[in-house]
Regions:
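Cysteine-centered metal-binding/redox modules
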Residues: 1-212
Length: 212
């Protein structure tokens, strides 16, 4: 707790005082969990009413570049970070609190492809943040110029050519997927900040997005 308090107050000077409580007793956790879920659900519900056309700025995150140097996560009202931990409101708050931090604003620019979700501002940002590895990104397509994946993604969306469809596998699933590969092997080829056609890391909440 003391380490977290030191981290938050040193990284975010706007926080003057903070207290942290860890609950490890099962009875107490069961008691507090419903309220925590209510808070998270209210946050997610608020975001579901917001569309990419309603805002002028997206947000980017490069927290994972330590192990995926060419990865840059683009966060929009209709696309969460791959890890599922950062939505558009979270990105906005983090950027305002620490403008020089790993989460930053991205002017969305011109909408180049409404079906696939290509924006000039996102293209320019990923070209810079990926060290020139790629210069185009489709925010809502798994083909041609798909969004890169780090390694922290909640799940993988993968193409199944035999039925011309997509499957989704959660990172906690330990069995084989319908294509005969477990999550661990699929993650190895999907991660690393590469654009891999037909295989994208994603947040589970993204399934609710109209752009999915």
């Amino acid at each position: 707790g003391d380490m977290l308090i030191f981290l938050y107050t040193s990284e975010l000077p706007v926080i003057e005082k903070i207290s942290i409580t860890f609950h490890t007793e099962e009875k107490k956790v069961v008691e507090l969990l419903p309220h925590a879920l209510e808070v998270y659900n209210a946050r997610d519900e608020r975001l579901r009413g917001l569309k990419e056309g309603d805002v002028e700025e997206f947000y980017g995150c490069v927290l994972c570049q330590s192990f995926a140097p060419t990865h840059c996560c683009i966060i929009t009202p209709e696309r969460l970070a791959n890890c599922g931990a950062i939505n558009w409101f979270d990105g906005r708050a983090a950027y305002k609190l620490d403008p020089e931090g790993p989460i930053f604003g991205i002017p969305k620019g011109e909408l180049l492809d409404p079906a696939r979700g290509e924006y000039s501002g996102a293209n320019q940002e990923v070209a810079e943040r990926s060290l020139g590895a790629y210069d185009r990104v489709y925010l809502h397509s798994a083909f041609e110029h798909p969004h890169t994946s780090c390694g922290c993604f909640q799940s993988i969306c993968f193409y199944i050519p035999e039925v011309d469809a997509f499957g989704i596998v959660h990172r906690d699933f330990v069995g084989e997927t319908v294509v005969g590969l477990p999550f661990s092997r699929m993650a190895g080829t999907t991660s690393g900040g590469k654009q891999v056609e037909g295989s994208c890391g994603m947040a589970l909440e993204l399934i609710r997005s109209p752009k999915f």
